[in-house]
């Protein structure tokens, strides 16, 4: 016969488990809006923590002044590109607005449409009918798509608002993390040690190294390439160079490099008979591309003694899997997995493996 106490214990266990799951799910829903901002703040603070300590030392040990200085730097780093982007979009849209608002819109005749086999004449006749109707027929044709266009702009406005919210949260969390960095670091290490007394602290150290390697080897390299490319575009007279600069940053972050933006700019210069500037920009583009292969491994080695290929693989995979925040998540996960496998093969802890690697690198 089953003991009633065992039944009570089982019931209590099930109810406790349900309660814990419910509390955990509710807590996740509460903190979900803040996760992205906190994640970005964590990555930024980890990457720039040595810079903050140097600034604090330079300012005579005043943490508050150093934290304010770092927040101002972050504001400039994020706001200046946004201002450039908005300015470029405004400059691009002004001619279109004037064109649409003018009363004498002149559409091209598109006579070449008649030369298209089979369907060319029919398309040309339909196009001429639209032009002859003074725009009324054209409006009726595009009216079904107006709802989708409006919905698209509403979604983009919502995304813009979310971006500003996450940017504000990122700055607030960065301020808190800079101010209480040591306490938070000790708490994370204690938590990691509770999970694994053998490898906990070493895994935290690996995560920090991976984040700094990405920040230096990928992000800093992308910014340097974008600035150099922007200088070349500005001097050669390519329009909307600020917008192209921002596109180059994203292209470099996803490991495509600056050439997908620079090569079309070179072609545009040649197309407009600016052969001298086109040739100079082509030479400058090759220089910037070669510089990428020199700076990236160098900066990754400064950030940590980790395999360059593993970092870059983590960056690309993380971006595809998690979006922009995956830029840091991917390398961290791959580096930890790599070190766990290597330490398991050699039968030593990650901490011992890291010590041996550090000693070898110092002796070399």
From Swiss-Prot:
Keywords, comma-separated and alphabetical: Cell membrane, Membrane, Transmembrane, Transmembrane helix, Transport
Parts of the chain that traverse the membrane: 18-38, 40-60, 65-85, 161-181, 215-235, 243-263, 280-300, 309-329, 331-351
Compartmental location: Cell membrane
GO cellular component terms listed in the entry, alphabetical order: plasma membrane
InterPro entries, per the entry: AI-2E-like
Major location (coarse): membrane
A Pfam match: AI-2E_transport
Membrane topology: Multi-pass membrane protein
NCBIfam families assigned: PRK10983.1
Recorded family membership: Belongs to the autoinducer-2 exporter (AI-2E) (TC 2.A.86) family.
Protein name: Putative transport protein BUsg_115
Organism: Buchnera aphidicola subsp. Schizaphis graminum (strain Sg)
């Amino acid at each position: 016969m089953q003991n009633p106490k065992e039944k009570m214990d089982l019931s209590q266990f099930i109810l406790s488990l349900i309660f814990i799951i419910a509390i955990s799910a509710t807590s996740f829903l509460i903190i979900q809006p803040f996760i992205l901002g906190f994640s970005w703040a964590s990555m930024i603070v980890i990457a720039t923590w040595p810079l903050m300590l140097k600034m604090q030392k330079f300012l005579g040990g005043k943490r508050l002044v150093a934290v304010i200085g770092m927040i101002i730097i972050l504001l400039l780093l994020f706001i200046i590109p946004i201002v450039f982007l908005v300015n470029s979009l405004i400059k691009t849209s002004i001619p279109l607005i004037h064109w649409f608002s003018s009363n004498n819109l002149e559409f091209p005749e598109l006579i070449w449409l008649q030369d298209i086999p089979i369907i060319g004449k029919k398309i040309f006749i339909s196009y001429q009918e639209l032009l002859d109707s003074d725009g009324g027929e054209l409006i009726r044709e595009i009216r079904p798509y107006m709802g989708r266009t409006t919905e698209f702009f509403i979604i983009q406005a919502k995304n813009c608002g979310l971006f500003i919210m996450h940017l504000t949260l990122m700055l607030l969390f960065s301020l808190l993390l800079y101010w209480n960095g040591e306490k938070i670091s000790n708490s994370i290490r204690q938590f990691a040690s509770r999970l694994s007394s053998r490898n906990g602290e070493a895994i935290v150290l690996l995560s920090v190294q991976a984040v700094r390697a990405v920040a230096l080897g990928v992000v800093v390299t992308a910014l340097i390439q974008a600035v150099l490319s922007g200088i070349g575009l500005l001097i050669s007279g390519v329009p909307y160079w600020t917008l192209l600069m921002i596109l180059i940053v994203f292209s470099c972050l996803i490991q495509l490099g600056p050439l997908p933006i620079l090569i079309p700019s070179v072609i545009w210069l040649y197309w407009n008979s600016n052969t001298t500037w086109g040739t100079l920009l082509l030479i400058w583009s090759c220089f910037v591309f070669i510089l990428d292969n020199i700076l990236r491994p160098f900066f990754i080695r400064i950030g940590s003694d980790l395999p360059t290929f593993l970092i870059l693989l983590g960056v690309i995979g993380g971006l595809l899997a998690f979006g922009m925040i995956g830029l840091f998540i991917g390398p961290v996960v791959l580096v930890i997995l790599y070190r766990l496998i290597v330490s398991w093969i050699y039968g030593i802890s990650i901490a011992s493996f890291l010590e041996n690697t550090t000693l070898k690198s110092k002796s070399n």
